[in-house]
Structures are given as C-alpha cells and as structure tokens.
C-alpha cells in the first residue's frame, strides 16, 4: 500500500501489503540502488511514520526521485540485452566495419519499428556512422520507451503498454487487472455499480517488471515472501540466479528444480506469482513449507521419464510428480497412466523389430511405478508399507513360479487383468483376479487381506503387486513370445 507521509523530508511510504506492492518494492529498491538514491527501510528506523500499517515492512522515499528520464535510463541499463539501439551503438564504436557488421546494423534497424521510422530511409554503408549515432542519441528516450513498452518479454508482458509512466488511471495497469475504460464498466463492480470497483493503480507498479525473474524465460516468477524488504530483495535475487544456472527443458521444470534446492532462502510458506507471455493474466502458486519439504525429499529419486503424447503435449513424469507434491495431490492417476504406457509399449512389440529396446523401456516403466507407489503411500500417511513390501515380494515369487511352470504368458495375462480392473476402478474384479492367481500358483498372499478390507483406500497394494509381476527369466520369455 502506498501512503503519503511527512517524515524528515520523505513524502512516500510503500508497504508490501499484497504481491503487486511487494513486487513494486523490489523493483524500486533496484532503481534506487542503481542511482544511489537515498531511501529508508521501515523496519530499520526507530521512529516510524505516523500512519504506517503495522505488521508490514516498507520503503520510505521521496516521490520526486522517480522521474521518467531516470526510469528510462534504468530500463536501458537493466534490460541492456534487449535494447537494440545499444547493440547498434556498440558495433558503431569500431573504426572499420566488415560486410557482416554492416549487414547486422541494417538488419537491427529493420527489426524495430521505432528505429525503422528514424533510420529506415538511410542505409548504413560503413561510412555514415555519424548519422546513425547522432540520430540514436537525439531520440534515445523515445527509442528506449518504445522498445521497452512493446517488448513481449518486457513491459508489455506485465502491463498495458499504453499506460507506461502514467498516473491517476481509472483501472490498474497490470495485465489481468486492467479494464478498457472506453467499454461498459458497470459489470466489474458489485451489483453492477462501477463506483464499487477498486482500481488501485499507482505509478510504482511500473517497477514490477524489474522484480520478476529472468526475462529470457517465457514464464517468469516473483517470490512474495513479504516478511521484510530485505528478505523480499534477497530471496528474489537468489531465486533468479538459480533459475539462470539451472539446466532443464521448460520454465516450469526449472521452477520445480530450483524450489527443490531453495532451503537456504525459503524456509516458510511463500506465494509465487508467475507471468507467462502466453497468458494475459498472472497466476499464483502457494507453496507450503510442509509440501516443499516433501518436494526436497524427492531430489534423490530417479523420476526422469518423458513420453510424447501428441505434437502439443509431452508427458513429463518428474514434472507431474513435483506439481502434485506442491499441490497436495496424490499420484493414483499418474500410476495408472504409467501402467497404460507399459501396455502401449507391449502393443508396439507386434509392429517393431526393436524388441530389446521395448523391453528395456517396459522395465524402466515398472521401476518408476514401484517408486511412485512408495511415494504415494508415504504421502497418504497410511501404515501399509509392510503390505506394499510384501506385495512386491509376492509379485516376484509368483513370476518365478509361473516361469518354472513354463507359463510366462500367464504373467502378462494376470498383470493386464489386474491393471485393467484398477483403471476401471472395478475393485471387485481386481480381487477376483488376484484370488484366481493365488489359487493357480498355490500361494497364500498375506498382503491381500488389507486390500480386501478397503480396496479403494489400499489400491497401492495392488499397484505394487502388479508392478512386480515380470518375466524375470529373459531367455524363457524370449521363447514364449
């Protein structure tokens, strides 16, 4: 929340009472530090302003220290990598130019509408650099502002580009919060009264783009742990650095990997705000410490498995497990999906000569299913680990017994029947199949009684048993295909 104050020459207090104000605080701190502008942190002053909000830290500053000229200078410095004119000036700093450099300058001019409008009629030939330098310098602020506000990964991703460095707006400038004032606005307020709608827009929201992580990522993040200004700034700095140093496909995967290794700077419940260039709104992920600890426990698990479903979607097991962990969702559906992948590979055997590769993939899938079952049971907190271990052991024993009887085909048959029943949530059928198998091999399954008591709640026992039914004797299994 922004408050006007009268405090020893300072006239403004901004407190991180919501994520927008918190992100603005982080961006402003970077701005003030860049220009070495004096400001104070609320928690660090003994005498507080009269009308501050208790329970929140904040920054105390002079409103006139925020000017458009300084703001654009900061933009140019902070997002230098995306400032096309800076790249051009860097090239023009040379005394001589290669054909490649000449072509690059002309291509860079064409790449931005504002530069094309200023220099499009003049082609760089290596002898007229003075014209290019003077034109850029004379129109520097216009160039910076236009490139920044129209950049899909810059201001435009976060705010309505028409509202950059404006004040007293009727609605908030942020994407997802902004309303077109030229259209009917009665529907946005309570009881169709636009007067009841709180726009809550401040100039300081223009500093929000500086608070989010790595602009080279399609989806960027802001960690709203607003315990104090110091933790806000330091956490987001560390978070952004870790994202930059983390290898992995997909921004969401990077986020999850960074969260796994964030114990040095995230040790309590936090809110993470994300903004994707594909969306016209912000998203929120609330990370509870309890779930974060469980996520960190997964760091030693071998969960890497990807499978192409169609041109637009790849199933990523690691991502699926991590997101369910954070959102406190169980893995039942993921386990069933992995079983379906196993049978898809089985059907591919008929159409492929690479039988050994398919067997290798199937073995990997079953290993992953075993891990998923253990994780699932630990999340549920059910005391059935003894039965899970027993089910896996009996699955291996049954497989060996069937191979001894030269009944390898029965392994696949019973396994498929059990999984088909579980996928259909037909637990009576699953019980029948397991009882039939018990009678066929002449073994009493001690784990089975727990499954009989409550099949829905204890289906992980059946998952574990089915995943352990494998043709362990590869030579025999080859002969029985």
Regions found by a protein language model. Name each.
Residues 178-339, 343:
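Domain-exit/linker segments immediately C-terminal to small folded modules
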Residues 143-146, 173, 224, 231-232, ...:
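Generic hydrophobic/packing signal
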Residues 103-171:
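A broadly conserved sequence feature marking short terminus-proximal activation segments
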Residues 146, 150-184, 189-203:
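Long amphipathic alpha-helical coiled-coil/heptad-repeat bundle
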Residues 1-124, 134, 286-481:
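Long, contiguous all-alpha helical interaction modules
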């Amino acid at each position: 929340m922004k408050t006007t104050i009268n405090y020893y020459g300072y006239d403004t207090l901004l407190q991180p009472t919501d994520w927008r104000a918190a992100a603005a605080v982080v961006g402003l701190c970077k701005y003030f530090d860049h220009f070495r502008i004096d400001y104070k942190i609320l928690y660090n002053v003994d005498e507080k302003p009269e009308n501050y909000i208790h329970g929140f830290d904040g920054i105390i500053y002079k409103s006139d220290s925020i000017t458009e000229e300084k703001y654009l200078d900061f933009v140019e410095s902070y997002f230098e990598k995306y400032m096309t004119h800076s790249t051009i000036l860097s090239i023009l700093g040379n005394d001589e130019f290669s054909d490649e450099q000449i072509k690059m300058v002309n291509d860079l001019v064409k790449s931005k509408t504002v530069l094309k409008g200023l220099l499009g009629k003049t082609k760089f030939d290596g002898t007229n650099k003075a014209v290019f330098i003077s034109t850029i310098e004379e129109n520097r602020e216009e160039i910076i502002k236009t490139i920044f506000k129209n950049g899909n990964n810059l201001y435009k991703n976060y705010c309505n580009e028409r509202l950059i460095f404006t004040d007293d707006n009727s609605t908030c400038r942020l994407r997802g919060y902004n309303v077109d004032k030229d259209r009917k606005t009665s529907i946005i307020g309570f009881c169709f009264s636009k007067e009841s709608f709180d726009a809550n827009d401040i100039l300081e929201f223009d500093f929000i783009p500086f608070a989010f992580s790595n602009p080279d990522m399609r989806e960027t993040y802001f960690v709203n742990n607003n315990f104090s200004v110091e933790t806000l700034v330091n956490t987001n700095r560390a978070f952004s650095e870790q994202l930059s140093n983390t290898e992995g496909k997909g921004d969401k995967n990077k986020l999850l990997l960074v969260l796994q290794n964030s114990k040095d700077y995230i040790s309590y419940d936090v809110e993470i705000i994300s903004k994707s260039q594909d969306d016209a709104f912000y998203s929120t992920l609330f990370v509870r410490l309890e779930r974060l600890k469980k996520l960190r426990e997964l760091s030693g698990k071998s969960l890497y498995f990807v499978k192409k479903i169609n041109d637009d979607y790849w199933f990523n097991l690691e991502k699926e497990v991590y997101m369910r962990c954070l959102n406190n969702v169980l893995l039942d559906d993921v386990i069933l999906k992995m079983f379906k992948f196993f049978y898809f590979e089985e059907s591919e055997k008929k159409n492929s000569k690479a039988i050994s590769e398919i067997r290798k993939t199937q073995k990997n899938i079953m290993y992953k299913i075993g891990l998923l079952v253990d994780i699932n049971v630990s999340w549920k907190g059910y005391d059935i680990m003894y039965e899970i271990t027993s089910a896996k052991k009996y699955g291996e024993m049954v497989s060996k017994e069937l191979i001894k009887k030269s009944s390898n085909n029965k392994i696949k048959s019973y396994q498929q029947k059990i999984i088909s029943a579980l996928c259909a949530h037909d637990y009576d059928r699953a019980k029948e199949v397991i009882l039939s198998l018990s009678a066929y091999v002449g073994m009493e399954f001690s784990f089975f009684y727990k499954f009989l008591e409550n099949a829905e709640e204890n289906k992980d026992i059946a998952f574990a048993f089915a995943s352990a039914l494998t043709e362990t004797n590869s030579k025999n299994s080859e002969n029985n295909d």
